Regions:
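Catalytic cores of carbohydrate-active enzymes
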Residues: 22-42, 60-61, 98-100, 173-176, ...
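Long, repeat-rich segments with strong aromatic
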Residues: 248-253, 298-306, 315, 319, ...
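Sec-dependent signal peptide recognition
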Residues: 2-7
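Long, intrinsically disordered, low-complexity segments
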Residues: 425-430
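Aromatic-rich carbohydrate-recognition surfaces in CAZymes
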Residues: 58-86, 90-186, 218-221, 351-373, ...
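Carboxylate-rich helix-loop segments that flank metal/cofactor sites and access channels
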Residues: 111, 185-205
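Solvent-exposed loop and edge beta-strand segments that line ligand/cofactor-binding
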Residues: 48-67, 73-75, 120-133, 206-223, ...
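C-terminal motif of bacterial Sec signal peptides marking the signal peptidase cleavage site
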Residues: 14-15
């Protein structure tokens, strides 16, 4: 017994002694990384050219802007960043909902059922109603704007008769009034592939339809948790109203969505049946993106985060993908989505997206897994240089697809590098 005790003490001391050496080695790697400077410069170059999601998109999307507004703050004046946010508030729905994106009205086309507002005649808006992240994305974007610029005057700006502060709360009220399921105490949306905005039942799949299968997933609810935290920091006088809501959503995510046995989030809770065959075991699928956002929302312990990144690394190995940006593993089988782009390992069904992989890197750094973060960052920054751009997604064979100037990818990698540099600075001061 005593021998085992002393062996345990010795092992603990050895681990403690090796940590400074490990950090020192990592700091050297960060400071001499052959890709980081290139990626930072390329990110600034790409973001200077505008605010649409990428060269394949005409619209400014709030879910994308949320991931590169801090990068944009490096090159644009505050009023330019603020104006983009104000467009979303001017186009807010009568029930408080927030659009996905906007485009100059004269360029509106391409099949969307466009939304117009008297408060903002210059633009046409659209909303992929299968998703439930637009409102949360706008709250997070305003928070990041205030953090990046120090300008909280936006909260008092008016769009019509309401201030931005009032409209932020209204958007959260929309989710509670129109997207909240009483039975589970969580937000719902359509069935999609993790964070995706394509449902299985339609050839395009971005709108709720009569044959939609309504479901609850971790991504929407984790985004809501982050938004509520941001809202309470922006508007501390409203904390009494929103703290109980945050606690309810947090507890119910753990209660209903976390699979303790398998140490993963279940893909969906179905409210009225699944769109998939009865003999399909959907819980075999591991959602990478939703897990990363859940970590950002504080839903997982250190041990659970460790298990999560280990599972992601194993999934990359099993799939042959290039990085932990892999949306999920295994993907949904052929034919499960009517949209032809959602084939196995295609687009949101198992494509490799730096846009979400980079968010996992950020959370690993913030949760003291900097070594693992650095390791998993390398394939993401390498392919930026190899392909001279920030591509939207990559195939399982690491081939670039989609927009080559995908600003969300640029934003998350740029921020991850900032966090690595902060890690180096803080450890140098110790």
């Amino acid at each position: 017994m005593n021998k085992l005790f002393f062996i345990g003490i010795a092992a603990g001391l050895l681990a403690c002694a090796s940590q400074p050496d490990q950090n020192e080695n990592l700091m050297k790697q960060i400071q001499t990384n052959e890709y980081f400077e290139f990626v930072k410069e390329k990110a600034l170059e790409v973001v200077k050219t505008g605010f649409n999601a990428g060269d394949g998109y005409g619209e400014v999307w709030i879910r994308d802007y949320n991931t590169f507004i801090e990068l944009s703050a490096e090159v644009f004046e505050n009023h330019v960043l603020k104006e983009n946010l104000m467009v979303f508030f001017r186009m807010q729905g009568d029930d408080g909902n927030i659009i996905d994106g906007f485009i100059p009205a004269e360029k509106a086309g391409g099949g969307y059922d466009y939304i117009y507002s008297e408060l903002e005649p210059r633009y046409a808006g659209h909303k992929n109603t299968v998703e439930t992240d637009q409102e949360s994305s706008l709250v997070q974007s305003v928070y990041k704007y205030v953090q990046a610029t120090g300008d909280n005057s936006i909260l008092n700006e008016k769009a019509g008769e309401k201030t931005v502060a009032e409209r932020l709360e209204w958007s959260m009220d929309f989710l509670m009034n129109h997207r909240h399921n009483e039975q589970y105490g969580l937000l719902w949306g359509a069935t999609t592939a993790d964070w995706g905005d394509v449902q299985p039942e339609h050839d395009w799949g971005v709108y709720l339809t009569d044959d939609t299968h309504y479901a609850i997933d971790i991504y929407d609810n984790a985004m809501f948790l982050i938004a509520l935290e941001n809202l309470m920091e922006l508007l501390p006088e409203q904390k009494e109203k929103w703290q109980p809501v945050h606690q309810q959503i947090f507890n119910n995510c753990r209660k209903h969505l976390w699979d303790e046995t398998n140490q993963k989030f279940i893909p969906h809770i179905y409210l009225d049946g699944s769109p998939f065959p009865d003999d399909f075991n959907e819980n075999e699928i591991y959602y990478h993106g939703g897990t990363a956002v859940a970590i950002e929302a504080g839903l997982l312990s250190k041990n659970e985060i460790k298990t999560s990144v280990e599972k992601m690394a194993e999934n990359v190995k099993l799939s042959g993908a290039g990085s932990i940006g892999l949306t999920m593993y295994p993907p949904y089988p052929e034919g499960f989505f009517k949209n032809e782009g959602m084939y196995p390992y295609g687009y949101q069904n198992g494509g490799d997206w730096t846009w979400f992989g980079g968010r996992m890197i950020q959370q690993l750094i913030k949760n003291d897994f900097a070594v693992e973060a650095y390791e998993h960052m390398q394939p993401m920054v390498k392919r930026v240089k190899d392909n001279d751009g920030f591509f939207e997604w990559y195939t399982v064979n690491n081939e670039p697809k989609g927009s080559g100037t995908f600003r969300g990818s640029a934003g998350v990698l740029w921020k991850a590098i900032q966090l690595f540099e902060k890690f180096t600075k803080e450890n140098n001061q110790q």
